[in-house]
């Protein structure tokens, strides 16, 4: 991250930290924190939505958006094959709608982030009493990367997050439907659909220890475990889907950075031990449900 990016990044992060303390103070005095959270999300939308040329996604999507047809041209088939086949249908249709409304790429990018912010608003309000703190953690941990480098994947993940309530309520159809919508933006939503049975199970401490051990062995011996998953997808999901997922994950799972010891890897390992093996010592809330725990286990495996 160069200086032109890092200075605004850390300034925005400092503002969020101050707003977290405001939220804590309001909570301690039994005041509502909704508007502090709305203000924080407003700043998040401005900061990320107006990022301009920053991030790899601009290089990927800018020219693609210029080639996107209006709705009339799309209906008549007046568009290039490359534009249509590069990305998933949901993202393509969103581009068509934006182009029909006369949006520039920068307006399209801002509206895209605005929609993500609305999803975050409802998700955090539903899941936690400390929404500004959750937004800060989201921004530091993965949020900036999502919206600057993985625009379509952000939609997929956010829709998955929203679908978790259907896992808790055992509403399989609604869960699958929402993630199928996510799949129209990023094919990796197929993993979330397949993960439904895993999200429902209750893992014992012995099983959690085995998972930790296996993941550490994969990490230490640099085992490219995604091959096992892709073999199944070639068989049951078709070569096209498997090829897409391999393309998306090759820079994550196969990359050397996946196997390097970094701050994220250390923090995730520490959090895993803290949540599952020493919750009383670290005063981890006992109200965390199995679905949330299982999501973290899956994240631990993939990170």
Language model features by range: what are they?
Residues 31, 124-140:
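Transmembrane-helix signature of polytopic, membrane-embedded enzymes
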């Amino acid at each position: 991250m160069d200086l032109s990016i890092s200075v605004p990044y850390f300034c925005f992060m400092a503002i969020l930290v101050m707003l977290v303390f405001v939220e804590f103070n309001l909570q301690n005095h039994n005041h509502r924190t909704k508007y502090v959270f709305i203000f924080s999300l407003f700043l998040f939308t401005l900061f990320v939505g107006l990022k301009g040329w920053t991030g790899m996604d601009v290089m990927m999507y800018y020219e693609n958006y210029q080639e996107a047809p209006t709705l009339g041209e799309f209906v008549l088939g007046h568009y290039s094959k490359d534009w249509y086949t590069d990305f998933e249908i949901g993202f393509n249709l969103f581009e068509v709608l934006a182009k029909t409304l006369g949006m520039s790429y920068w307006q399209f990018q801002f509206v895209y982030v605005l929609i993500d912010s609305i999803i975050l608003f409802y998700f955090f309000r539903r899941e936690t009493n400390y929404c500004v703190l959750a937004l800060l953690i989201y921004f530091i941990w993965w949020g900036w990367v999502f919206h600057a480098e993985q625009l379509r994947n952000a939609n997929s993940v956010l829709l998955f997050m929203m679908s978790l309530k259907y896992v808790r309520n055992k509403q399989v159809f609604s869960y699958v439907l929402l993630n199928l919508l996510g799949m129209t933006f990023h094919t990796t939503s197929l993993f979330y659909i397949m993960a439904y049975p895993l999200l429902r199970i209750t893992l014992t401490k012995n099983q959690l220890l085995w998972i930790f051990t296996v993941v550490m062995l994969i990490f230490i011996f640099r085992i490219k475990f995604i091959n096992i998953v892709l073999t199944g997808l070639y068989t049951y999901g078709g070569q096209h889907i498997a090829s897409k997922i391999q393309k998306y994950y090759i820079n994550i799972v196969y990359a050397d950075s996946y196997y390097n010891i970094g701050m994220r890897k250390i923090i995730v390992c520490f959090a895993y031990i803290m949540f599952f093996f020493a919750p009383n010592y670290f005063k981890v809330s006992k109200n965390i449900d199995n679905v949330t725990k299982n999501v973290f286990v899956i994240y631990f495996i993939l990170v």
